[in-house]
Regions:
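Positively charged n-region of N-terminal signal peptides that target proteins for export
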Residues: 1-6
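Bacterial N-terminal signal peptides
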Residues: 7-16
Length: 259
């Protein structure tokens, strides 16, 4: 009886091995397709009604992502914003992320994102009004992919953002843009942070609206007392380039910050 049990166990292991061997592993599956990609929920946002959330899901027909809503109790799915409604010059706008206004009537669509330090924290922002269907780009005339951390005012009548280390406020009804800080530079940083604050403290977004929407509190960083590290970039061109950035070593001075 023992011999029979061992024989059956051997056959089971052998059949499992043969089954695994039959599953061909290709470079295309690993690097080109999402066959072994991590599964998750993209950019989940809790809705104002407290019974549903929104998320992003790929629309294969359009080649971009829909913004969809799920009822948490029933699981019912509905498309809030189809990708076909978010078009520019005949092409769908590729959503990297999105931000709701407090009343869920407006949305900021974040796209064309570029990497800053570890994460893609600068890009372009578009305004979507779900009541009127209006869809337009903010920051008209500004350099592409340079806006950071855009956010609605509490009344959703204005949007504030960082552009080249200065803070701006844009009126959504008139399009008028007001610059709030003027000393932003490679050494003076308003509304965001230098490398060490992101790397060691995990903070990137450096400003907030006041509850009444009349003021903005922001971090101001002065990196002039911090030593400069020079990184060699050998990947963006056939010729290397030097990238300087403030990099405090152990025992040296960090950037000076204030709110």
């Amino acid at each position: 009886m023992r011999i029979v049990s061992l024989f059956l166990s051997f056959l089971f292991v052998l059949s499992s091995f043969v089954s695994v061997q039959a599953q061909e592993l290709t470079l295309e599956d690993i690097y080109k397709t999402r066959k072994y990609g991590q599964r998750g929920v993209a950019s989940m946002r809790w809705m104002k009604d407290n019974i549903s959330y929104s998320t992003l899901e790929m629309n294969r027909e359009v080649g971009a992502r829909d913004i969809v809503r799920y009822d948490v109790k029933s699981g019912q799915r509905s498309v809030l914003v189809p990708a076909s409604n978010l078009m520019h010059e005949g092409e769908p706008v590729q959503i990297h992320d999105y931000i709701w206004s407090e009343d869920n009537t407006k949305m900021l669509v974040y796209t064309n994102s570029q990497r800053v330090w570890r994460d893609n924290t600068r890009g372009d922002y578009w305004l979507l009004d779900l009541q009127t269907g209006e869809f337009r780009q903010l920051g008209q005339g500004l350099d592409p992919s340079r806006m950071m951390f855009a956010k609605f005012s509490p009344a959703a009548d204005k949007v504030a953002y960082v552009y080249y280390n200065n803070i701006y406020v844009e009126d959504l009804s008139t399009g008028e843009r007001t610059q709030l800080t003027f000393d932003g530079s490679d050494e003076i940083i308003n509304g965001n942070f230098d490398w060490v604050y992101e790397e060691e403290l995990g903070i990137q977004d450096g400003f907030r609206w006041s509850p009444d929407g009349k003021s903005i509190a922001y971090w101001h960083s002065d990196t002039r007392g911090t030593g400069v590290f020079y990184m060699i970039n050998n990947v963006d061109s056939i010729y290397s380039s030097v990238i300087p950035f403030p990099y405090p070593k152990a025992g040296t001075q960090n950037s000076a910050v204030k709110v």
